[in-house]
Amino acid sequence: DVLDRERGLCRAVSDTGSEAKARQGLVDAVFASKVSPDCKELLDATTTCKWRSPAALTRALERQGVRAVLRGARQADRLDTVADELFHISRLVRGQASLQVAIGDPNRSVKDRQKLLTTLIGDRVSEDTLLLARRAVVSSDNTFEQVVDGYLHIAAELAERRRAIVTTASALTDAQRAEMVKQLER
């Protein structure tokens, strides 16, 4: 978020025209005492990479942060739960136009949109899911549903699975659902 807010800082950290040591020093000065050692290690690694643009740097950091949360969920054997909850949240938002507008409204503060989401789902989902859903509200480039879909794609990669969305005219019975899963697993 700091790199998104502080465009000059982001440009300086991603500027491949300057020495990697200078970029490293900048990262140390700004972040050393404010982030976890793992986060600091990731930020240090960014200073040695070549970035097409400052936005490419922030997108990469965002993806790595999402991966870290999802890896933690996988290690705790909660990845399927988190992915399922994210999918249902996305469907909930997609299915209600007023909610879609409220969560995506650029005239509302990010904090307000996150509070709305927390009020709706906070006590119904895992901590990891809530963290990711609140993070998905931050994006100004994509809709909430698009961001969550990206998170679901990362979750599927981590689980070494493919995703399939099946739409039916009526609710499936347990037997039909089992048969569908069997067919999709082929």
Residue ranges, per PLM feature:
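Elongated, mostly alpha-helical coiled-coil "stalk/stator" tethers of large membrane protein machines
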Residues: 1-186
